[in-house]
UniProtKB/Swiss-Prot annotation:
This is Fructose-1,6-bisphosphatase, cytosolic. It comes from Pisum sativum. Binds 3 Mg(2+) ions per subunit. Mg(2+) 1 binds at residues 71, 100. Its EC number is 3.1.3.11. It is an enzyme of class 3 (hydrolase). One of its GO terms (cellular component) is cytosol. Mg(2+) 3 binds at residues 121, 124, 283. Substrate binds at residues 124-127, 215, 247, 267, 277. Its main location: cytoplasm. It catalyses: beta-D-fructose 1,6-bisphosphate + H2O = beta-D-fructose 6-phosphate + phosphate.
Amino acid sequence: MDHAGDAMRTDLMTITRYVLNEQSKRPESRGDFTILLSHIVLGCKFVCSAVNKAGLAKLIGLAGETNIQGEEQKKLDVLSNEVFVKALTSSGRTCILVSEEDEEATFIEPSLRGKYCVVFDPLDGSFNIDCGVSIGTIFGIYMVKDFETATLEDVLQPGKNMVAAGYCMYGSSCTLVLSTGSGVNGFTLDPSLGEYILTHPDIKIPNKGKIYSVNEGNAKNWDGPTTKYVEKCKFPTDGSSPKSLRYIESMVANVHRTLLYGGIFLYPGDKKSPNGKLRVLYEVFPMSFLMEQAGGQAFTGKQRALDLIPTKIHERSPVFLGSYDDVEDIKALYAAQEKTA
């Protein structure tokens, strides 16, 4: 009998064990972050279960309401938002919540407050629920100096001030990708155990990739640098092979593929939407944080994405993120345009 093999299967690094290990490296830690993360993990498990049962439980379809973005809300959108608001509030470790689904920030009542602000998109890509495409939850976490007097200014910070970010993808498996500021790790939900197990330790994005990811349906409205970059991807003049286009209307799915395989994800501004469509706080910042922690880059067309200082909780920004060298290429095109302007 292969006892060594059995031992390998039983020595599982769960996400809770991983975070506790990280906590032990910081003597000043009191366990607040671990408790907060456990509530986020619980929310992800609940939403994963709801997504898997959506068709049977009649959660597919519209809820008959629109969110602050003017988008029709799916039933799962509404449910997912309620799940995360309740999970984060009951943790006793948050003071402000910003959700894609809510017009205003949620200020936690004083008796339940903690030192963290959480920004999140409870169900990114929900447009694809009905057809079974991978969708996900995106989140970012800030820490405040004084939670008793916390204001909106404590949330409107540059992304570089985040203490953690991640996403949970609900697809063929349920995968949670997390960074606490010291690299990126991926955990997969084992349904038989009900635990997220470390399956992708220390994720590093390749320096250059063979894939680009963009909605080419908007090409006629793109600016010069984006148009030139995509042309270069399809028709390289340096003798290299063309890049392959891979795109689906789910940021989590696109970014997850880019993170693992390399390449670049582009959501530029255009003539119709000069500021792009992705929200800074709970889409651009968390994904940019993860990309940088994995060795990649994130750029807005003007500056490093994580240096942006938002002025509104639902502010939008263009973003180009992915492999370091691929993002360098599009940065060079924007720099060249600046020189000729």
